[in-house]
Design a protein with these regions (language model features):
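Noncatalytic alpha-helical scaffold of FAD-dependent oxidoreductases
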Residues: 1-144
Length: 144
């Protein structure tokens, strides 16, 4: 897993916030921490984030990308729920998200040669989106 964190503001505040972020990452068991010290390094880190969907596509040419929004405080629980739902359907699921605004992109990877897989993908995607919008028991989400 990769966590890309960007800190913005005036120089003194950015330095202080960066130290807080670094300490939180270390306390959470981060195996590696990289800090961009130039705009070139920053762009290189962002290139990795932007290339994520291409990497998924190279490994799994058939995937279904969703776009949901949840309160930031709910992201850990939603991530667990999304992975549990994907697993219950037998799908691998990658997750990319903008944690700062609660926007997440669960990506279901599947083999299109499997009989009925597209129906299962859409059913699974519907369950995931119901998690994201808080529909637990009733209601409907149209997934196309």
């Amino acid at each position: 897993a990769v966590l890309l964190i960007e800190v913005e503001g005036i120089a003194d505040a950015v330095d202080a916030d960066s130290e807080l972020v670094k300490a939180a990452c270390e306390a959470s068991g981060a195996s590696e921490i990289r800090v961009a010290t130039s705009s070139e390094e920053r762009e290189k880190l962002w290139e990795g984030r932007k290339a994520a969907i291409g990497a998924i596509g190279a490994a799994y040419p058939a995937f279904y990308l969703l776009d949901g929004v949840v309160p930031r405080t709910k992201l850990p629980q939603v991530m667990e729920d999304v992975l549990a739902v994907a697993s219950s359907y037998g799908f691998k699921c990658a997750n990319m998200f903008h944690a700062g605004d609660g926007n997440l992109h669960p990506t279901l990877m599947f083999d299109p040669q499997n009989q009925g897989v597209l129906d299962r993908v859409l059913e699974c995607a519907g369950e995931i989106m119901r998690i994201c919008v808080g529909i637990r028991v009733c209601g409907s989400v149209v997934v196309r």
